[in-house]
């Protein structure tokens, strides 16, 4: 009967309808009647889909676990896995078996043709056996198959289904692989690693306060853009050995990021030059698109174990300010600027750490290797300014207008705001570096005297072996220089920097960038004017886990003809725990009257090669006027790459993010046992009316620097309530903390932080109503970042009771990322203290999953690789691009900007 719902009955009727369509299609010439042929082919395809769908259900019930595995479908694009896939495969198999070939796939068609014939033959056999079972063992409206297991026909059907299932699976893999590009096993594993990177990035973002757990639990669509952007940053500078390791061959990089390899390498080099604060600003910008502001103070948790999140083994920051005055003087008597009159080499060294740090630089000059090593111990008793001086090598250019290559000069140019080219500053290229002519014997004599006096002063020298080289095997951004070097021809031999091909765009290969731990010396010829320079460094060390060193260096060269000056500052990372500061002062006067003076400051580390490489890459920042410009450029590049993935690998990204959301969602809360009815003696305490609502600051509640708090009737309920849509808010703060605005008294919320004990002093000014124009109370509390509580209280008179009602206490115990985080969101309730009643935003509708909507919910068109799914933000339905082309703001959900909505919702929302 036609209304029989059993599997065998449904198969019987579907097979009869398919046979009728196939017979009609064979009864006429399709070329004579193309319209009729096209219509019948469409009906044939639909009939094949129905027959194979019912056959699959029968195989699931009869074969069970004996079905052929189809794990290879994980390599298929999502667009291929549709309900009509089986029908397309059957149609393709019949075409191949009939002698047709896939366009531009003749070779693959010839390989698949025997398998296609076997598939069609096996399918015909299965259809015949199933028709027999329909007539013999069908039970009307039965939910399961009731076949006689002792019947030979049943056993034959079972074996035929197994053969067909195996052949059809093999043909599916070959046919789909020939029609579309499928992932290889290696690519599939790479994308799994990228999925792991996404998950670790999300966990890190939740930990440092960039994202909130509520967004993950609610499957916030904005995370589909934020997570890939943050993953690019994390994969380049934090999880360096992960899938975004650009040092590995291009074949080992996923196809998702392989087209952007060169761009990613440049981005990696720039990201490594950022400080922890700047990196946090960039990540915050990638999440919120808010304005960049680097002028705010950071509140950092000293106990945070995320030092590897920005730059591994980096806890010190050296701020270097360099002032250079260069001149050329023909008068030898004026070149002496040091106070020391003797010709002896003097060293003043103080011990700051028990660890010794040795640096050397080697150089081949006329087949002779010259080296000078310095090993200083610095005292830990002196934290104030110390003179520092060390003589290593001085590279003087023939034209002083081109500048001198001296330590840290490339760093001084990183953040300079002038438009002057490098040659007009004080970085010289290899071709511009030249020395006066001098004999090798003279150089060796100077070096021997220097080394002898170094040994006499108790300073050790190290052999310049390759094993002790501070350069990395894979990344050598600098070339060390020997002390007081020269050649007979007056030329300096060039060493090419060993860098990746992609790094050559930064012009680092043509710049001789000096190690921060190296120093400068001078080499004069007998027939040229003597050149001297003097450096003075002042260091101040503040003892903290994230200590900041400041240094000022000045070099003066007296001249009648040339004079140049440059000033800049840079932040150079150093290593805590293994770092030691080296200060030395040396004056050298050879017997011939050549005079050279130099003082330098070096920040050395036990494992400084990696830090030096990171610092040298900072030369890429030289093309950016300000740090904001650098962060903006990085934002554009990172967002461009991440957003391009949304187009090129939309299905893969959706699958990855779905897995990430499932993994990182909060576990469901256990059901609480039913509470016992309260007895007369144990009456429930009446709740405080103010505890029924959680007030959040709105735009009118947050006091900005431009507002006048004199007649304001609003109050700030918590210092951590900051509206994210306030245009005055800027992206500032630190990992684990969110920004707290600082404005002028008496309405300021001031924060101070001390690393070490990590004590935060919070000053909150509360402005009360009732016509009072002055702040009632400012209370300071010292709290720990690990257990933060911000309390606003009032001890005034008239408004004491009112303000006590609005007393709120927010605690973030055990969560470093909770302190100061902005909790306001588009869906959070707003403060209702104004005279006008405010409506709380509604919760947005839950999106219908893609798998539950095979067709457009408006026009009922099936989705294809070209007809994509789109969700309406108002009703959550799934529509095609035509039916969801409208956009409108949805203020009831807190969405003030226009978002995608379907046509019906657009008419309804705009009409209302």
Swiss-Prot record:
Pfam families: FYVE. Residues 530-544 have a biased composition (Basic residues). A zinc finger (FYVE-type) spans 850-910. InterPro entries: FYVE_LST2, LST-2, Znf_FYVE, Znf_FYVE-rel, Znf_FYVE_PHD, Znf_RING/FYVE/PHD. The keyword Metal-binding applies. Zn(2+) 2 binds at residues 872, 875, 902, 905. Signal peptide: none annotated. The keyword Transmembrane helix does not apply. Zn(2+) 1 binds at residues 856, 859, 880, 883. Keywords: Metal-binding, Zinc, Zinc-finger. Residues 455-468, 545-556, 572-590, 705-717, 735-745, 780-801, 822-834 have a biased composition (Polar residues). Residues 333-355, 682-699 have a biased composition (Basic and acidic residues). GO terms for molecular function: zinc ion binding. PROSITE patterns: ZF_FYVE. Gene3D superfamilies: Zinc/RING finger domain, C3HC4 (zinc finger). SMART domains: FYVE (SM00064). GO terms for cellular component: early endosome membrane. Residues 323-360, 455-610, 664-745, 769-846 are annotated as: Disordered. Residues 486-505 have a biased composition (Acidic residues). Residues 323-332, 591-610 have a biased composition (Low complexity). Negative regulator of epidermal growth factor receptor (EGFR) signaling. Belongs to the lst-2 family. PANTHER family: LATERAL SIGNALING TARGET PROTEIN 2 HOMOLOG. This is Lateral signaling target protein 2 homolog. It comes from Aedes aegypti. The lineage of its organism: Eukaryota, Metazoa, Ecdysozoa, Arthropoda, Hexapoda.
